[in-house]
C-alpha cells in the first residue's frame, strides 16, 4: 500500500490538512514523535516545504525514530546526524536531544506484549524492538544525555522499558532526565510505583479506555485489565 498511501500527492495533502487542523484548534506547539518512520529524508524535505512558511502559526517539536537513525550506523555516527539536525533547527521545526524508541506492538491490533495470563484467546504480542536491543539503545542515548521516549502498550512492554531505565540509572545516575513512557495501554500498580521511583513520566493514551475497553473486556483481556487501560490516578 505504501506506493499509494505515500504518493507525493497524498503525502503532501495530508500534511496540508494537518496544518489546517492544528491551526483551527489553536495549538501553538505540536510534536512529531517518530520522524523517519516512513522515509527520513523525504519527511524532512516535505515537512520543511509545508511548514517552514510564514503562514504556519505553530511550532513542531521533532523527535527522531531511534531505530531509523541508528540503522547501519555506529552510535557516534548517529550522534553526528542528530547533532546536525539540531544545529539546523528553526523556530518552526525544532530538533533537540530527544529520541523515540519502541518496545512492543500496536494496541489496536492487539500486539501489545502482556504479562501472564496474556490474551484470553492465547495469541501473543510482538516486539517492535527486541528487549536486549532496546536496552542497548536506551543505555547509549542515556549516556549521551538524551531525553528518551519509549512506545509501550502492554504491561510486559512497560516492564522491559522500566528495566532498561533502571539499568541506565544504576550505571549513570541522572536527575530530571525526562524518560517518558508513551501510550501505556496496560500497566500494573507496581509498575506505576516503579516508574515514579525512577523519575519516569507517562504520556498515556486514555482514549483506549473509551474506545476499546468494552470490546477488549469481552474478547481480549477480561474486565479487570480492560477497566484499567491507561492506568492513571483520576
Spans of features found by a protein language model:
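Secondary-structure transition/capping motifs at alpha-helix termini
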Residues: 50-59, 84-92, 143-144, 167-177, ...
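Non-cysteine beta-strand/loop elements that form the S-adenosyl-L-methionine
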Residues: 92-111, 200-210
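Active-site-adjacent C-terminal substructures of enzyme catalytic domains
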Residues: 186-234
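Histidine/acidic-residue-rich catalytic or RNA/ligand-binding cores of hydrolases
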Residues: 41-44, 158-166, 193, 212-218
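Active-site environment of divalent metal-dependent phosphoester hydrolases
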Residues: 36-39, 154-159, 186-189, 209-212
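Short amphipathic alpha-helices and their capping/turn segments at secondary-structure boundaries
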Residues: 75-98, 187-199
Amino acid at each position: 500500500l505504501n506506493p499509494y498511501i505515500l504518493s507525493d500527492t497524498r503525502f503532501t495533502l495530508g500534511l496540508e490538512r494537518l496544518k489546517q487542523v492544528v491551526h483551527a484548534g489553536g495549538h501553538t506547539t505540536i510534536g512529531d514523535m517518530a520522524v523517519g518512520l516512513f522515509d527520513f529524508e523525504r519527511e524532512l524535505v516535505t515537512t520543511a516545504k509545508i511548514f517552514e512558511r510564514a503562514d504556519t502559526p505553530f511550532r513542531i517539536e521533532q523527535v527522531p525514530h531511534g531505530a531509523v537513525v541508528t540503522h547501519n550506523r555506529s552510535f557516534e555516527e548517529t550522534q553526528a546526524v542528530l547533532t546536525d539536525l539540531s544545529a539546523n533547527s528553526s523556530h518552526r521545526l525544532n530538533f533537540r536531544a530527544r529520541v523515540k524508541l519502541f518496545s512492543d506492538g500496536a494496541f489496536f491490533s492487539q500486539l501489545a506484549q502482556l504479562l501472564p495470563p496474556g490474551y484470553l484467546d492465547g495469541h501473543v504480542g510482538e516486539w517492535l524492538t527486541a528487549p536486549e536491543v532496546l536496552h542497548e539503545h536506551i543505555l547509549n542515548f542515556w549516556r549521551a544525555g538524551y531525553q528518551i521516549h519509549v512506545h509501550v502498550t502492554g504491561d510486559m512492554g512497560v516492564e522491559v522499558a522500566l528495566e532498561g531505565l533502571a539499568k541506565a540509572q544504576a550505571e549513570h545516575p541522572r536527575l530530571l532526565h525526562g524518560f517518558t513512557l508513551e501510550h501505556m495501554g496496560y500497566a500494573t500498580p507496581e509498575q506505576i510505583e516503579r516508574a515514579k521511583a525512577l523519575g519516569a513520566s507517562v504520556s498515556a493514551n486514555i482514549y483506549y479506555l473509551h474506545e476499546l475497553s468494552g470490546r477488549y473486556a469481552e474478547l481480549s483481556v477480561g474486565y479487570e485489565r480492560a477497566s484499567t487501560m491507561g492506568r492513571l490516578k483520576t
